[in-house]
Amino acid sequence: MTARRPLPYFLAKGAFATSRAGEHGISRSRMRAADLETPFRGVRSAGLDLGDLVQRCRAAEVFMDDEEAYSHSTALGLWGAPLPAQFGAARAALHIGTPGATRRRRVGVIGHRLAQGTPMRLSPDGLRTVAPSTAWCQFASQRDDLSDDEMLVALVAVADCLITGRRTTGMRDDPACTPDEMRAAVIAHGSGRGARMLATALSLMRVGVDSPKETELRLLLHRAEVAEPTIGHVVPTRLGPLTPDLAYPAKRVLIEYEGDAHRENRRRWRGDFERVRAFQQAGWTVIRVNADDLADEVRCNALIAQLRLLLA
């Protein structure tokens, strides 16, 4: 059996245009080998995880022009924004914006025309995107099958993340943009698709929110006309200063949202137990909320009733 010819070292983990394969000494038969994938027409890749957004975008750069940029939900994903599941699905079509009158047409790509002067940025991974605030406004037009309430929660959750920064391994990344940049982007968006919902989401975004579920919880309280909780309130405890997810300092009531990671990690579960006990010993009433509470109407109503009683 003839040994498979190795790829050039610089393509061992990357992508290339089939039209330029000959320049790299890659034959047509080599391009049909099992170790190469076809992420897009006219492109071959090796060693890339095409289910990963960043690596799929790197493969697409092979055919993109210098002035093009990732836009809409693709850009938001590259900035680490928490998107509804259907927008972050592996192998989902990439949104690519092109300045001027034309737009990119290719299987696996949704092309868009960008206005001249659309602000651009480099993502944390060095990929060219429209500015995160602009991508957020574009995302408002991507309704898919989301209801009005679901889309509003998604927009606010993304906005909270962009102006706060993601928390990873205990540290918080720098915010992708400022509240003022978000406001300016909405003004620039004008009366485009989703303008009314963007204005509402703009009024509801808050700095300091750590997760989309915390956003969902906060908006649940907003819809129920419960007083708005404080974000980022520091409580002195025997463990030192602790910051609950949401707090009502005047009533010494706080809310902690606990996702599955809190339950599945034994060390974290024990830490949560001590954290709650420290809050209680400091004289605070602690309400612990999980995903089931937000998904079930009866439990939602019970949570709201409990809060109203405590805040009365």
Predicted region positions:
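Short gly/ser-rich loop at a beta-strand->alpha-helix junction or flexible surface loop bordering the NTP-binding
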Residues: 1-193, 312
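Surface segments flanking catalytic/ligand-binding clefts of nucleic-acid enzymes
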Residues: 20, 25, 166-312
